[in-house]
C-alpha cells in the first residue's frame, strides 16, 4: 500500500527499528525491491534521485513506483532523494511522491532553514512529510567526507523547520568506501536527545559494516539509505550474465537474475536494520 513518509517513520519509532530506503533506477530495480519487502513483510521507502525525476526516466518511472506501491502487501513510501530546490520538490509532488527530501546542506545555515521551512509548509497541504539535511554528507572521493552535524544546530533546525526526519553527518559518505567507515554513535545519541527524539536519517549506508549499522539503529537512526550497492548488485549480475555463451536473448528473461540479485541484497539490509516482519 502507498503511504506517506510520516507513516513509515512512526512505525519505525514505535517499533524501535529502521526503515530501509532503497534507490530505484528502472522497472527491474523496483521489482527487486518490492519482492524483497513483500517476502520479508517489511515497510520500506523507494526513492528516486532528482536527476531521474527531471529526465524522461522520472516521467515513466514514477507511475511504475506508484503502481508497485499501490499493489504491495506492505507499506511503501515513494520518496524524492536529495531534492535541491523548490522546483524539484514541486515536480516530485506532481509525480505523486509521498515523501520529499529537501537537501539544503551545502547552503549557509540560515538559508538551509528558510528553504526547508518553505518546502515543509508546501508539503503539509498534501500531508507529505519532509526530510531535511544538516551537516554535509559528501562522497567517498571527498577529502574529509563530512561536515559533522552538531546537536546545537540540529535542535534549532528541527524546531524552526518542522521536518519529519533529519539526515545527519556522522561518519558516512555517498559511494563505495576504500576502507570501512566508523560511525560516531555518541553523536547520534546526542542528536536524538537535542532534537527531542526526532527521527534521524543515515545516508551512505552501502558498505557500512553490519555492526556499525546495528549500533546506529539502536542509537536512533530511523531511516537508512542504500543506493550504491543496489547499482552494484544489478550491474555486476548483468555483466556476469553477459559472459555466458548461452545467455538469454529476450530481455525479460535476461533480467530475471539481476532482479533476484537486487532482491537478495535488499533482504539482507531489511533484516539487518530490523524491519523484517514489521509491516
For every predicted segment, state its role:
Residues 2-3, 269:
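Bateman/CBS regulatory modules and CBS-like beta-alpha motifs in cytosolic regions of diverse proteins
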Residues 209-279:
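C-terminal alpha-helical cap/extension of soluble enzyme domains
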Residues 3-14, 25-52, 59-75, 83-198, ...:
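Alpha/beta enzyme core
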Residues 17-25, 49-53, 253, 257:
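A short N-terminal beta->alpha junction/helix N-cap motif
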Residues 202-204:
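Thr-Gly-centered strand-to-loop micro-motif
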Amino acid at each position: 500500500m502507498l503511504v506517506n513518509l510520516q507513516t513509515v517513520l512512526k512505525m519505525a519509532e514505535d517499533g524501535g527499528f529502521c526503515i530501509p530506503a532503497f534507490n530505484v533506477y528502472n522497472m527491474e530495480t523496483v521489482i527487486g525491491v518490492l519482492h524483497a519487502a513483500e517476502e520479508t513483510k517489511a515497510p520500506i521507502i523507494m526513492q528516486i534521485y532528482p536527476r531521474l525525476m527531471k529526465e524522461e526516466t522520472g516521467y515513466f518511472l514514477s507511475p511504475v513506483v506508484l503502481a508497485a506501491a499501490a499493489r504491495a502487501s506492505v507499506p511503501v513510501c515513494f520518496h524524492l532523494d536529495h531534492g535541491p530546490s523548490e522546483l524539484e520538490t514541486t515536480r516530485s509532488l506532481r509525480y505523486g511522491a509521498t515523501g520529499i527530501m529537501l537537501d539544503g546542506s551545502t547552503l549557509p545555515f540560515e538559508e538551509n532553514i528558510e528553504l526547508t521551512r518553505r518546502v515543509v509548509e508546501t508539503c503539509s497541504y498534501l500531508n507529505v512529510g519532509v526530510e531535511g539535511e544538516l551537516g554535509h554528507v559528501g562522497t567517498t572521493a571527498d577529502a574529509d567526507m563530512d561536515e559533522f552535524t552538531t546537536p546545537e544546530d540540529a535542535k534549532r533546525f528541527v524546531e524552526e523547520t518542522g521536518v519529519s526526519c533529519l539526515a545527519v553527518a556522522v561518519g558516512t559518505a555517498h559511494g563505495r568506501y576504500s576502507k570501512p567507515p566508523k560511525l560516531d554513535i555518541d553523536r547520534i545519541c546526542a542528536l536524538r536527545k537535542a532534537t527531542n527524539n526526532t527521527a534521524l536519517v543515515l545516508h551512505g549506508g552501502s558498505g557500512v559494516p553490519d555492526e556499525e549499522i546495528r549500533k546506529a539503529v539502536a542509537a536512533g537512526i530511523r531511516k537508512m539509505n542504500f543506493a550504491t550497492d543496489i547499482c552494484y548488485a544489478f550491474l555486476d549480475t548483468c555483466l556476469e550474465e553477459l559472459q555466458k555463451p548461452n545467455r538469454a536473448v529476450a530481455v525479460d528473461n535476461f533480467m530475471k537474475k539481476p532482479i533476484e540479485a537486487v532482491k537478495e541484497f535488499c533482504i539482507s539490509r531489511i533484516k539487518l536494520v530490523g524491519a523484517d516482519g514489521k509491516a
